[in-house]
Amino acid sequence: MADNRIAGSLPTSSKWSFLPKSVSSHFKPSSNPRSSNPDIENAPPQNPNIHNPRNQSVSSKSTAYKNQMDSPNCRSQVSASRPRAISALKTRNEVEEEGASNPHVKVVVRIKPTKEYCWKVKKVSKVSYSVRDRHFTFDSVLDSNLNQDDVFQQIGVPLVRDALSGYNTSVLSYGQNGSGKTYTMWGPAGSMLEDPSPKGEQGLAPRIFQMLFSEIQREKIKSGGKEVNYQCRCSFLEIYNGQISDLIDQTQRNLKIKDDAKNGIYVENLTEEYVDSYEDVAQILMKGLSSRKVGATSTSFQSSRSHVILSFIVESWNKGASSRCFNTTRTSRINLVDLAGAGTNERDATKHCVEEEKFLKKSLSELGHVVNSLAENVHPGISDRSLHKTSCLTHLLQESLGGNSKLTILCNIFPSDKDTKRTMSTLRFGERAKAMGNKPMINEISEEDVNDLSDQIRLLKEELSKVKADACHSVGSKNDYFGAKNARESLNQLRVSLNRSLMLPKIDNDEEEITVDEDDFKELHLQIKSLRGSFNQKLKKFPVNRDSVNSSFVTAFGESELMDDDEICSEEVEVEENDFGESLEEHDSAATVCKSSEKSRIEEFVSENSISISPCRQSLILQEPIQSESPKFRDSLRKSIALSSSCLRNQNSLAKSIKSTCFAESQHIRSSLRGSKIFTGSTESLAASLRRGLDIIDNPMNPASNRCSVSLSSDNLTMQPPTDDRLPLSPLCPTCRICSSKLPSVVEGDGYHMEGVLEKQQELEKLCSEQAAKIEQLTRLVGQHKLQTEDETEKLMGASNGERLPSANENQLLSCITETYDVKQISDDDSKKTDFDIGEKEALLKEIEDLKKKLQTPVTMSTNELRSSLLARSFQLRSKNAEKDIEEERLRCTEMESEWISLTDEFRVEIETQRTRAEKAEAQLKQEKLSSEELEDALRRAVLGHARFVEHYTELQEKYNDLCSKHKATVEWITELKKAVAKAGKKGCGSRFAKSLASELSALRVERERERDLLKKENISLKIQLRNTAEAVHTAGEVLVRLREAEQSASAAEEKFNEVEEENEKLKKKMEKLKRRHKLEVVTIKKSLKQNTLPESALQPLHQRNSAIEEEGM
C-alpha cells in the first residue's frame, strides 16, 4: 500500500527533481551503491570487510585495529550495548520505572571509520572511556563496525517511546566537518523511500518517523473502547549567516523569533505542514535537504554550511467510551538538530566564504558558552533567558538546553592524527553537556485542568476583545490592529487552518470478502434454534409488558443502559419553593433508584447469554427548556442617592420592595427550572450553580435593609435614629431652618411657647396702662407747676437780696423729672424684652420731648442753673446706659457669631459624613451591579449549557430512532430468514437455499463495491475542489495583504508628500520675506544715492566701469 501510494503521488523522475544537479548526480541509484566518493560528508562509511586497493599502504595498521575491534571482549561489549528491536512500546508505568536509569541528557559518541591509522578508544568502566590517555564520561560509544540500525536502536527507539509518553525530546548532531553528522542523521537522499531494513542506509530521522507512525497505528488498534486521535505537524528551518529561512516554503526568508506566554518560543510565519504518514514526512525531508546550503571545505568538497532544525509535534487526545469529552490531551515535540562544522576552504578565500565561516564559528562558540554556563550552574534546570538570546541557534534550543526536554547529543568524531584538536574539542563538548540538568515533564492536560482553566480562558477572551476594540478605535496609530504586520500574521494563521481542513480521514481500501458455506449455514441455523429456545424460557420467567419501552444498548465495555421514560416520568416529586436543592436531590435519587433496579434486572437477563427482542416504540420528543429570565435589578431601585430625610425615611420600605421583587423573580426562576427539569442526572452541576446564584441574590438584601439611617432634627444638632411618624421638613437651606427654629411664631403645635407669649403680652399691656396713668399725673403736675411758677416769679421779683430757697414745688418737680426718666428707662428695658413696634417707641419719645418743652417754657432765668444740673445728670445717666447697651450688643454679637461658627462647623461635619455615606452607597451599588452582571453571565452560560444538553439529547434521540429502525429491519430480515429456513427444511433443499443466499450476498457485495467506487470518485473530486478553494482563499489573502501593504506605503508616501509641500511653503514664505527685504534695501540705497552731494560727472566713470564689467560677464 505504501509503495503504491508513493509511486502514485511522487514518480521516480520527480524524486530527484528536488535535489540539485551536483547532489543528484552522486546519489542516484547505480549498480554498485558502495562505490560512492568517501570524501562527501553524507556518503556512507567504508566497510572494512570489502577489499580496496587504495588501502594497501595502511593494511597492517587497519588490520590491527580491525582485530582489536573483532576481539570477543569488544564483541560482547557491543552486543551488550545494542538493544534489540522493539515490536511494541512499553506502557507508561514501565517508562516511569526506567526513569531512574534513563538520564535526561544522554551523550553518545560515534566513530567514523577511516583509511588511515587511528588512535584507540578504550573502555575503562561502564560509562568511562579513555582517549589518548584522557578519560571522558559518556553513555555509550558506537564504533565503526556498527551500522545505521544500531544507532537507531540506541537513540531512536527510546526517543519514540518518550515522545508517545508525552515528553519533549531532542537529538543534537555535533562534530567536525566530514565526521558523518548528516549521514547519521538523515542518510543518503535515495534511501528515504526505501523499505526499512536492519542493513539499510536510512538515517536516524527516517527510521524514527517510520516507527512513530507504525506505533500510532498500533495504539489506535489496541485502544479497545477508547477513542484515540493523533495529529502531527512538521516544520523545517535553516540558520545561515545568522538568518532563519523556511525550507518548506523557500519564499519565507529572514524570519524573526517571537516569545510569548501562550505559544512560547516560535518562529514567526514559519510553515507547519500537517502530516498523517511517513511518506509526507519523507517528501518534506527531501525537499528541505535539497535546499540546504552546502560548500567545499578542506575535509570534503560537499559539506553542510548551515544549521537545520526539524520540529515534529505530536498531539494526542484520549476519550473514554462513557465520557462525552476528551479525558487527557498530550503534546510532545521532537527536535532533530543537524549542526554544521566549522571548517575552512584553503582554496577559496573569498569574502562570502570568510563571512560564512565567521558566522559558523560564532554560533558554535555561543552554543559552547551556553553549555558551559548550564553545566556549571548550581541549580540545574534553571536557565537565564538572556543567556540563550545571544544567537538564533541557542534561542531556538532554549527548551532543549536546560529546559523541559530529554536531550541526546550525538558526537561524531573522525579519529585521525590530522584533526586531533577538533576531535578532542568535540569530546570535551560532549562531556560538558553531560553535566547539564534538564527538567523534562509530561505535557499532559486532563479534564480537571480544562475545567479549572475555563474561567481564565473566558477572562482572557474578554481582555482580548477589549484590546482589539481599543486597537480598532485608535485610527492613525502605528500599532494599528489592521496593519500589514498583523495582516501577515492572520494570513499565516489562515494558511495553517486551511492545511488543517485538508486533513480528511483516509478511506479503508481493504476489500472484505464474504464466503458462505453449508457448514456456516448449519451453525447459523443451530444458533437461531438455541436462541429461540432460550428466549421462550426467559419469556416464561419474566413476563414482558408490551406497553412499556425496554430498550438496552450494550456498549464496548459490556455495560447496559436503559431508557425507561414512563417509569422515570411517573415518579413526580413535589418541589417546595423554599427548598430547591432538596427537591433536586430527591428527584435524582428517585431516578437513580429506578435506573439501578432496571439495570440489575437487565444484567441478570443478559448474563445468561440470551437476547430478547421486543417491538420498540419511539420515546417522547424532548422539549426545549423554558427561557428563564435572569435576576436583574430594576431601574427604580437605587439609581441615585439624595441626601434628604425623606429618602432616608423610605429606605426600609425600599429594601422591602427590593426583597419582594427579588423573591418574586427567584420564584419565577425556580418555577421555570422546575418546568425544564427533564434530565435530572445530567443537570446536577447546573442546579448547584443556580442554587448558589439564588442564595447570592437573596442574601445581599439583608445588609441593605439593616442599614441605620440618620436624620437632622431642628431642636438639637445630634444624630438620631429615624422614626416612622416624623414630619417631612420644608425644602429650606440649613441657615434658614435654624433662623426659623429660633422664632417661636414658626413653631407649630407647641403649647408651652404659646403660653409664654400670652404672658408677655399681658405684662406689656399692664406696663402700658401704668405709663398712661403716670403721663396723666405728669400733665396735672405740669398744670399745677405753671400756677406755682407764676406766683413764685412775682415773689422773687419783689425780693431784694436776690437769694432764693428751694421750695417744695421745685422738689416735687425734680422728683417728677427723675420719675419720668425712670419710667423712660423702664420702658426702654421693657422694649428690649418685648416686641413693641418702633412707631410706638418714637411716639413716647415725642411725648417726653413735648413735656420737656412745656417744662422749659415757663421756667425763668432763675431756674436755669437747676435745669442745667438736671440735664447734666440726665445726660450722664444716658451715656452710662448707652455704653452698657453697646457692650451688651457687642457681647450678644460675639455670642451669635460663635454660635453661627459652631453651627457652620457642625453642618460641615454633617455634610462630610453624608458625603462619605453617599460614596459608600455608590461603591456598594457598583458592587451590586457587578454581582448582578456576573449572575446574569452565569445564568446565561447555564442556559446555553442546558440548551447544548438538550441538543445533545436530541441527537441521541435521532440516533436511537435510527437504531430502532435498523433493529426493526434486522428483525424482519431474521423472520424472513427463519421462514425461508423452515421452508427449505421441509422441502429438503438446504443446499439450494445456501447457494441462493450466497448469490444474494455476492450481489450485495458487488453493489457495495460500486457504491464504494462512486464514493471514492466523489471523495477525490471533493479533495480537488477543496484544494482549489484553499489555494483560491490563500491567493485572495495574499492579495489582501499586499493591498494592505500598498495602502500603508501609499499613506506613507502621502505623508512624505505633505511634509515636502509644507517645507516648500515655508521656503516660499522665506523667499517672499527676502524679496521684501531686498526691495527695502534697494529703496534705501536709492535714497542714500539721491542724498549724496557728489556731482554727476564724478559718478559717470564709476557707472561706465560697472557697465563694462557687466558686458564682459555677458
UniProtKB/Swiss-Prot annotation:
InterPro entries the record matches: KIF15/KIN-12, Kinesin_motor_dom, Kinesin_motor_dom_sf, P-loop_NTPase
Biased composition (Polar residues): 10-39, 48-80
Annotated Kinesin motor domain residues: 104-436
Keyword set, alphabetical order: ATP-binding, Coiled coil, Microtubule, Motor protein, Nucleotide-binding
Annotated spans, Disordered: 1-84, 1092-1114
Stretches of the chain forming a coiled coil according to its record: 761-791, 872-942, 1038-1081
GO biological process: microtubule-based movement
One GO CC term on file: microtubule
Residues the entry annotates as binding ATP: G175, Q176, N177, G178, S179, G180, K181, T182
Keyword Transmembrane: no
A single MF term (Gene Ontology): ATP binding
Protein family (similarity comment): Belongs to the TRAFAC class myosin-kinesin ATPase superfamily. Kinesin family. KIN-12 subfamily.
Name recorded for this polypeptide: Kinesin-like protein KIN-12F
Organism in which the protein naturally occurs: Arabidopsis thaliana (Mouse-ear cress)
Gene name for this UniProt entry: KIN12F
